[in-house]
Design a protein with these regions (language model features):
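N-terminal juxtadomain amphipathic helix
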Residues: 1-67, 227-228
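Conserved class I S-adenosyl-L-methionine
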Residues: 85-95
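Conserved SAM-binding loop of SAM-dependent methyltransferases across substrates and taxa
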Residues: 96-106
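Conserved SAM-binding motif I beta-strand of class I
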Residues: 107-112
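Conserved SAM-binding strand-loop segment of SAM-dependent methyltransferases
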Residues: 124-140
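A conserved beta-strand element that flanks and buttresses the S-adenosyl-L-methionine
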Residues: 152
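A short glycine-rich, Lys/Arg-flanked "PGG" loop and its adjoining helix->strand segment in the class I
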Residues: 164-181
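Short, glycine-/aromatic-enriched active-site segment of Class I SAM-dependent methyltransferases
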Residues: 182-205, 209-210
């Protein structure tokens, strides 16, 4: 696959990571460069940051700290219940449970690799796997809990480096009529608003609709609805 490098934003430290010292020694920096993939039409970081450097037991961002996000997830949960009436739901990147907690009346499973956050949802009696989302994990979850009517993921899929495996794992965990709901930054909106700050270590990709179609069709998934949100 041919890649065209087109933007170099220099060296940056890890985000969402508070360090113990004012001037820590050997702080990790990465080269923030962007690439365009000619076949898939994906925009990605030229070099990915190792996931465990970003997502670990010191991860700082908690979605429920924002009143706006708390209300947005509560509203979205109501919308999903009304439209799809799921009997089971899986969230990839469940953070501190701000979304998945609204589905306590059905089978609700979280996947969250940051242990400090996974511990929070476990205390909320939400079964949470403190693992990175992979095909192997999807098989393990299927074996124990069955497949799901809805799989939801907000601001997480763009963080995962192996996209083909990611979507195959999602397809593997959905019921025949199941729905996957993805919420991530839009390349179009980022360009229209000159939001270059959407490009950083966690955002391995920033998706266009064309790129998403090219990736999801490999896994047997089909895009049937697109909405623009104001929360990211």
């Amino acid at each position: 696959m041919k890649k065209i490098n087109f933007l170099n934003l220099g060296k940056h430290p890890i985000t969402n990571n508070f360090l113990p010292n004012v001037k820590p020694k050997n702080e990790f920096f990465y080269n923030l460069k962007l690439s365009y993939h000619t076949k898939t039409k994906l925009i990605s970081l030229n070099n990915f940051v190792p996931p465990k450097k970003m997502f670990n037991n010191r991860y700082a961002h908690r979605a429920s700290a924002s009143m706006t996000m708390r209300q947005a997830y509560a509203d979205l949960a109501k919308k999903i219940k009304k439209k799809f009436n799921p009997r089971s739901i899986l969230e990839i990147g469940s953070n501190d449970g701000v979304f998945i907690k609204h589905f306590s009346d059905v089978q609700n499973i979280g996947v969250e690799p940051c242990k400090n956050l996974a511990d929070l949802t476990t205390k909320m009696k939400i079964k949470t796997y403190d693992k990175f989302w992979t095909f192997q994990l999807s098989k393990k979850i299927n074996k124990k809990h069955g497949k799901f009517d809805v799989i939801y993921s907000a601001n997480t899929i763009s963080h995962i480096h192996k996209l083909n495996e990611t979507f195959k794992a999602i397809e593997n965990s959905l019921n025949v009529e199941g729905v996957f709901i993805l919420e991530d930054p839009s390349l179009l909106k980022s360009l229209q608003k000159l939001s270059y700050d959407q490009f950083y270590d966690e955002h391995a990709y920033v998706f266009s609709i064309t790129a998403l179609k090219n990736i999801t069709k490999k896994s047997g998934l089909e895009i049937f609805n697109i909405e623009t949100l104001n929360t990211h």
